[in-house]
């Protein structure tokens, strides 16, 4: 089971927090659709901003979006213009959705940007960087070896696995290649495993990238 499901999903409530922190009875399906729209807008607008995570918190009238990134200045922009532009796109999309669903409720939207200080511990940032390098036509094996070498220098990471799939280096037949170091106990629920995935758009088609980082085991603190 550990190899068939995303590592962060199977560990929700154990050692991984929920990415959306809210609960409503009647409006859940509408708010879930809004959350998907918010994430889509962020991922499209900030593709190269080194985003580690996007968390969403809600009350009945307020929406708070927390973006963790290693390039906060790129998101905020000069005099806050970047973050205001991002907020305007989200507001426009949410209002269109609510109009379509006939929901007439006022709301406020707040965006907080948190700086990610250590990019080498973020699977999402690493997968985005691999995708960027592959799009720049750097050979995938060179990218993977360099990434594994950089990860191996970090003592906090006990194991790592990289996987790329698609028409690698323009090959006629798509294939999957992987590279790993250390341990990767996917079936151990107390294992702290960070997972990230990205897609590189090349002239030969899409190349999928997956990254697993094992950071040791998490035990409950004794009172």
Regions found by a protein language model. Give the residues of each.
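RNA-contacting regions in translation and RNA-metabolism proteins
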Residues: 1-223
